[in-house]
Regions:
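Structural microenvironment flanking redox-active thiols in thiol-disulfide oxidoreductases
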Residues: 70-110, 120-126
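N-terminal "domain-start" segment that seeds a small globular fold
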Residues: 25-49
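N-terminal secretory signal peptides and thylakoid transit peptides that target proteins
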Residues: 1-14, 18, 22-25
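Short loop/turn microsegments at loop-to-beta-strand junctions
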Residues: 34-35, 57, 134-135
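Thiol/disulfide oxidoreductase modules built on the thioredoxin-like
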Residues: 108-113, 120-164
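Hydrophobic beta-strand core positions in alpha/beta domains
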Residues: 58-60, 92-94, 138-139
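Short active-site neighborhood of thiol/selenol oxidoreductases, capturing the structured segment around
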Residues: 49-67
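Short, ordered coil/turn segments that flank beta-strands lining enzyme active or ligand-binding pockets
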Residues: 42, 52, 142
Length: 167
């Protein structure tokens, strides 16, 4: 095949890959400000993104019906326990299709030590980029900028290195 023809045939694939990689968490683009959001937590209180200014924090969109979400939860707990005394926090947002009673039961049974919020209306998932795949996890820096978006289970060793750099 001629080099020019090969280039023309591969160009659409390269464009698609360049567009899709950031969406899939395959590479980091410039940090952007986290959307201003209000999280209604299980105890009925609320937190906002402004409450986390000055902290490094993890935002995890998950569901009790998501096997990957359930499997990664012990590592999210471990990460929270490891860094929470150093200016780190975590918010786990249950998707709108997750029955609140299931979320409450899950959080109580596993003793989740961090903020667990309900997204009853789907507004949070929409505000954070029309989240539909779970788990989807964001790492936010002390200035409130999204520094990483991960679709699927994070590489927790790499995530810990990133958290260490940001703290």
């Amino acid at each position: 095949m001629k080099p020019r023809r090969l280039l023309l045939k591969s160009l659409p694939l390269c464009v698609c890959a360049a567009w899709a990689l950031p969406l899939l968490g395959g590479c980091d683009s410039a940090a952007q400000a986290a959307p201003q959001s209000r999280f209604v937590v299980l105890d009925g209180s609320s937190k906002t993104t402004a409450d986390f200014k000055g902290k490094v924090w993890l935002l995890n969109f998950w569901a009790t019906s998501c096997t990957t979400c359930v499997a990664e939860m012990p590592e999210i707990i471990s990460t929270y326990n490891k860094y929470q005394g150093r200016g780190y926090d975590t918010v786990a947002v249950a998707m709108s299709y997750d029955p609140p009673s299931y979320v409450v039961n899950f959080a109580q049974q596993r003793g989740l030590p961090f903020w667990v919020a309900l997204d009853n209306t789907g507004e949070l998932a929409k505000a954070w980029g029309d989240i539909s795949a779970t788990p989807t996890t964001f790492l936010i820096d002390k200035q409130g900028r999204i520094v990483k978006r991960i679709v699927g289970k994070p590489d927790f060793a790499a995530l810990h290195l990133e958290i260490e750099k940001l703290l």
